[in-house]
Amino acid sequence: MVENVENNNFNLYERVYISLSRTVSNFECISEELKQETITEALKKSQVINEYVKYQGKLLPFHMFVFEVKKNLLSKNLEG
């Protein structure tokens, strides 16, 4: 059971990473460490329910979850 959850999180990580790479300009210029940290942090706070992701108390379609992660990533990139 735990293995299945880990696989689902890994698949979600990949989906988020790929979506961000397609939607964030200069994605390749952002450090891999920051990308991994931001995505992992968001996944720890989320739960997949059918085709939606529960994140920070909101049930979001996947593309809106990616948008939230994108905002966090760009904000952290500007700070650091």
Named regions from a protein language model:
Residues 1-25, 29, 43, 58, ...:
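A short, charge-rich alpha-helical start-of-domain segment used by transcription regulators
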Residues 22, 42-43, 51-52, 77-78:
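Enrichment for repetitive, rod-forming helical segments
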Residues 31-35:
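Short amphipathic alpha-helix in the helical subdomain of ABC transporter nucleotide-binding domains
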Residues 46-68:
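Short, aromatic/basic-enriched loop-to-helix "N-cap" motif that marks the start
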Residues 67-80:
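Arg/Lys-rich amphipathic alpha helix in sigma70-family domain 2
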